[in-house]
Amino acid sequence: MENQKNDNLNLLEAVVQNTGMGKNTLEQIVPMTDDVQFKAELLRQRNVYHQLNQEAHTAIEACGGTAQGQSAMAKLNTKMGISMKTLTDKSTRNLAEMLTQGSGMGVVDCVKAQKDYPNAAPGAKRLVQRLQEFQEDSRVKLEQFL
């Protein structure tokens, strides 16, 4: 039972960190584009990340835990990386490429988390699977802007 609780908390924390990264990245990138269709897609994705993040937070609290989220250093590293990659190129194509790569990394993180925490409850597993499917779908949608 304790093993399942730990796997639940760890898997849900992975969702919190993954969705936090997506949400924070999109909040930084949205103001960089004037492409109306691209911006609409980014806002849609940001809202889904926010929703999944809230669901994971709620589930962690229901398990008696407290979500940690991304560390300040991880947030800073991401922010600086985006700033460097967009310093000279804020084109829709470049932004879409960056986000496509990020979505791919998010999918890999979901797969790893599911393998690392096999004893998690079905609800936690469904949440990470929804996140993975969303990120796979997002990557395909972003490829339209390459």
What are the language-model segments listed below?
Residues 1-146:
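Amphipathic alpha-helical hairpins
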